[in-house]
């Protein structure tokens, strides 16, 4: 069973629907016991870092997540991935969960290229920089869907994949059993479903 952590941020039910499409059992929950019983955890999220971190801390689930991530796979998606980092510079400086060494910084592409805007909204090719079971069902250069204005930086040792937005944008990270994708697998069509399938098999 996959527990989708509900802390009042993000479209949890489109993610649950994608997992159901794969024949996977998933529950949307803020219950610590359910999270402990789950085989895998997903931390979704959209919006601002500080607000999301405050809401997550208010649930009392941060210690539970840290404990469970020692024993089972955890996947952060979009803002959920950013929360995995040590800190963010979105509207000030804010501490994150600290699973991934690095920081979350503003997306600053070369705006001389008029086709590049912030936020990055849309499809971009995913370039795999390390072999990992998370990507066992996809090929180099498949397209995934992004919606973001900030990205993970200074995290080379954890980076699994990048996308080009005139600068290399961290697309996916891993630290131990903890994974993150800046893109939305649940919005990335068949490619995203294959990534979620791989996560369910970790």
Where on the chain are the PLM-derived regions?
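Short acidic low-complexity segments
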Residues: 26-37
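Amide-donor transfer/coupling interface in amidating biosynthetic enzymes
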Residues: 103-202
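Cysteine-nucleophile active-site neighborhood
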Residues: 49-120
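Short gly/ser/thr-rich secondary-structure transition/capping motifs
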Residues: 21-28, 55-59, 125-129, 162-164
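Short acidic/histidine-rich motifs immediately flanking catalytic phosphotransfer sites
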Residues: 36-45
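N-terminal beta1-alpha1 ligand-phosphate binding loop
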Residues: 2-24, 183-187
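Structural alpha-helical scaffold elements that stabilize or flank donor/cofactor-binding regions
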Residues: 34-35, 68, 172
